[in-house]
Amino acid sequence: MSATMERRTPEPGTWLGIPEFPKAAKVGLANAQLRKNLAHATTTIRAKRVVRASEVPDWEELRTAAAQIKDRVGRHLDTYLLQAEAAMTAAGITVHWARDAADANRIVADIAKAKGVDEVVKIKSMVTQEIDLNEALEAEGIAAWETDLAELIVQLGHDLPSHILVPAIHRNRREVREIFVEEMGRYGTPAPEGISDNPPELAEAARVHLREKFLRAEMAVSGGNFIVAETGTLVIVESEGNGRMCLTLPKTLVSVVGIEKIVPTIEDLEVFLKLLPRSSTGERMNPYTSLWTGVTDGDGPQDLHVVLLDNGRSRVLSDPTGRAALRCIRCSACLNICPVYERVGGHAYGSPYPGPIGAILGPQLRGLEDARDRALPFASTL
């Protein structure tokens, strides 16, 4: 970003300077409030998951089927990607290919500049965290506003995400209230005077703060939980409705999706839609499950772009053993059961992908040149 250009969005935290895992873990262990916040949240999520999984008689068979589908996609990924590209193109979607983070960030920024927009609203997305899209857009004078409640807390708090599913899991409601009171007014509608730390009040403040951004946004950016190869259908699941707002109000939608998110057919998608909500949020189904195939006149975005991102995934795929990490559907169940994560938190892992899967997938995607990545095998009790 130019030295003369004023920031539009809150200055985020940075992964730079976070020490190697053994040292970072000691910092987390010394924070009693952090451990209390994490223990409360992960215990709650674990209990809900156990109840919902027990309702499905063939739960383990479903998990096996999902792994087999992912493995089949990995063996024939080139074929499925080309099939998905053809189907999406036929449906009116513009497909882009990004080798790495720089490619993806450039593509998204170029689309925004071509549309003449200086701000975008975002759906919660791990992959855009991975490529640091928000800062890349900020450097181009484009404000990226997070609309997921937890991501909003992280953004307004000049913070970093610490959990795959609940990025602000390390914050309690008292801290959230302080962030809203101090920061909301700097970037839009302020928090109501005299707001308490009662969750409904905090949620209402976030809703009002975000509504003006939704209504004026001309472009949205999302990730994607799945892409169905045979139909070119994109799938996003979420629990708050902010994603549905991003998918329906703006005229332009850009979805950045990792190449491993392909599933062959709608029937295959069914397996994952049974597993993901129960394993992540402990719900029978996500309150908002959005599937869209191309452009429909008068309904939703009229200009759709999909950026298919590699960013190290091909390298992971070339490892006969390590490629199993690409089965991950970002449910976060491994974080919620991990005694190490529960005690040290997500920031100790030094990247947007924390917990057991992050300790594996992060170094696979980035390589082992950084000492922090070489230290991540120590983030295990095995």
What would you call each of these model-derived segments?
Residues 2-321:
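The feature marks the mature, well-folded catalytic cores of soluble enzymes
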